Amino acid sequence: MSLTAGLTDARPDTVETATVAVIGTGAIGRDLVSKIDRSPGLDCRLVAGRNPESAGLRYAESLGCATTAAGIDAVLAASPFDVVFDATSAASHRDHWPLLEPLGTLVIDLTPSKVGQMVAPTVTGVAAEDARNVNLISCGGQASVPVVHALAARFPVTYLEVVSTVASDVAGRATRLNLDEYVTATGHAVTTFSGVSDVKIILNISPAVPPATFRTVIHARVPDADAAAVRAVVDRAAEQVRSFAPGYEVVACTAADDLVTIVLKVTACSDVLPPYAGNLDIINAAAVLVAEQYAARPGRVSRTGVSS
Amino acid sequence: MKQVVIHDPTLRDGQHAVHHRLGLTELRRYAEAADAARVPVVEVGHGNGLGASSLQVGLAAATDDAMLSTVREALRHSRLGTFMLPGWGTSDDLRRAISHGVDVFRVGVHATEASLAEHHLGFLRDAGAEAHCVLMMSHMASPGELAEQAARAVGYGAQAVGIMDSAGHFLPPDVTARIGAIVEAVGTVPVIFHGHNNLGMAVANSVAAAEAGARIIDGCARGFGAGAGNTQLEVLVPVLERSGFATGIDLYALLDAADLAERELMPAPPVPASMSIVSGLAGVFSGFKHRVVELAGAAGVDPREVFFELGRRQAIAGQEDLIVDVVAELSGRGPKTDAA
């Protein structure tokens, strides 16, 4: 299966654009709006927050997007859209989904709510044809799932541990309140896509100055692992991820005494994020890819949202 | 006489000194001895708390469930405490700990990150458990910042709040200023001080904390803890009593518990060894020690200089990669440009 080819070919030059709304105006919502703005296949029609003073709303206005501080209610009133991105919190998403579901919109959830179908583009493809709620797992999930999936497919992995470090100033309130959900959703994804049931997930929020670039360390127990073979598998997985998240790199990869340690780093490639915010960049890049491929899908019935 | 509550994390923070390998027999034996001395709170767990057994920091010898139930059974008078770091443990771990009969929960966060504890403090409050919030690496924040973070933690539901001198960097006036600012900010909420002994000041700092209004003071038998160790419990208690703070602890039984701890928990009691003194002076996480010594040795650089440079860069736990940069720079192999 040539997923990489599929992913890169999926950005059409000219097709009918998909109409898009974004809920949530934190750092992740702002970067999403920026990435949507750059995407020829997506037309951002509404950005909804809850605080009229938020910098995220002002940023969206500066790009010419319609904005509202009336949150989900405004999105429902202006519906239908082809795609609604939810960049709020896991608890908010669980409230939003029953309201959005009847509209037939594709909902792309960036919170660790575990509601929708989990997507890590290079592993799952972008989404099943009939998926209406696509879940992007978590930043640590996006960083680790391609590698743990590839490792477990090739080696008899018995235990997986995923330790991610996020800079404090790009961990907003929703992230801080959702640490349990992060751990649960990431663990569920790692187990689902590796088949390894014994997993441990850890998230560090680091206030270091200068801020630490987003890192994910994977520790795996692999009997008799061959270092060169592991490195080849990991490099191949990373190359695929770079097709949509170019700042994804393997910093270190060692195998000794049944213990494999892989250090991944994601540098943000974004108009609005600092380079260390790779956690937001990778999940948003995956989310926009899902929307772009949905927009390019033959036979898609377009929906119009509020005109801007 | 004023009262202080002694909180004893020997069986949790001490785990760092033995790679989290304390067995259930050792846990039970020390818990019984501390209980006999009427130590008010006995804390147990992996060194990084609930759910933290991992390849990243070390696999515990026993599960959280086994550790908690073993110590619970050993305590007749003392209350049972445990610890958690949000992002390492989860509410599921807290729920299970509650079911094991834990009385006092400590939620730890970096000094400037109280909001990371918001969810779990709220969870514990709603569950009716006693929850404390401790601000770690507190030398990296000013008294005013610590006071603000402490007040936030109280707003989230913390029933006691305080600071850990994780790097063992403070001198008594530093503690007086910080505890004073926190006491002023949180009013009647009990304030916690948890010392480390890198500069030999842990007991003196704890007395300064009590005099500045702290009402919960941490100490470990024989100072059992990573590097230079923690505040030495069996010295702390009589010194507090002589300073006018009642602890309710039986001194002879406490000395017996400390003797047992030295015999059964540790290869040797911790002392402020040279590298611990340097990391304390530099205000750097002592867990960097092995990596600093290893990399500096390989590059022919003085590891003491590496520690002081890491301190200037405000390196914190998790930034082990910075050690590589500093060693390379000090060895003259091309300075990096992204220094703070």
From Swiss-Prot, chain A:
Entry binding sites for NAD(+): 25-28, 279
GO biological process: catabolic process
Active site location: 139 (acyl-thioester intermediate)
Entry keyword set: Aromatic hydrocarbons catabolism, NAD, Oxidoreductase
EC number: 1.2.1.10
Reaction(s) the record says it catalyses: acetaldehyde + NAD(+) + CoA = acetyl-CoA + NADH + H(+)
Organism superkingdom: Bacteria
Pfam family, one: Semialdhyde_dh
MF terms in GO: acetaldehyde dehydrogenase (acetylating) activity; NAD binding
Alphabetical list of CDD domains matching this protein: ALDH_C
InterPro entries registered for this protein in UniProt: Acetaldehyde_dehydrogenase, Acetylaldehyde_DH_C, NAD(P)-bd_dom_sf, Semialdehyde_DH_NAD-bd
Family assignment from sequence similarity: Belongs to the acetaldehyde dehydrogenase family.
Full protein name: Acetaldehyde dehydrogenase
Curated annotation (Swiss-Prot), chain B:
Catalysed transformations (reactions): (S)-4-hydroxy-2-oxopentanoate = acetaldehyde + pyruvate
Enzyme class of the recorded protein, top EC level: lyase
Biological source species: Streptomyces griseus subsp. griseus (strain JCM 4626 / CBS 651.72 / NBRC 13350 / KCC S-0626 / ISP 5235)
Keyword Lyase applies: yes
Listed InterPro entries: 2-IPM_HCS-like (IPR050073), 4OH_2_O-val_aldolase (IPR017629), Aldolase_TIM (IPR013785), DmpG_comm (IPR012425), DRE_TIM_HOA (IPR035685), PYR_CT (IPR000891)
Active site (UniProt): 16 (proton acceptor)
Residues reported in the UniProt entry to bind Mn(2+): 13, 194, 196
Pfam families: DmpG_comm, HMGL-like
Keywords: Aromatic hydrocarbons catabolism, Lyase, Manganese, Metal-binding
All copies of domain Pyruvate carboxyltransferase, residue ranges: 4-255
Binding sites annotated in the UniProt record for substrate: 12-13, 166, 194
Coiled-coil annotated spans: none
Keyword Manganese attached: yes
Family that this chain belongs to: Belongs to the 4-hydroxy-2-oxovalerate aldolase family.
Name the UniProt record assigns to this protein: 4-hydroxy-2-oxovalerate aldolase
Domain of life: Bacteria
Entry's Gene Ontology molecular function annotations: 2-isopropylmalate synthase activity; 4-hydroxy-2-oxovalerate aldolase activity; manganese ion binding
Feature type site, description Transition state stabilizer: 12
GO BP terms, alphabetized: catabolic process; L-leucine biosynthetic process
EC numbers for this chain: 4.1.3.39
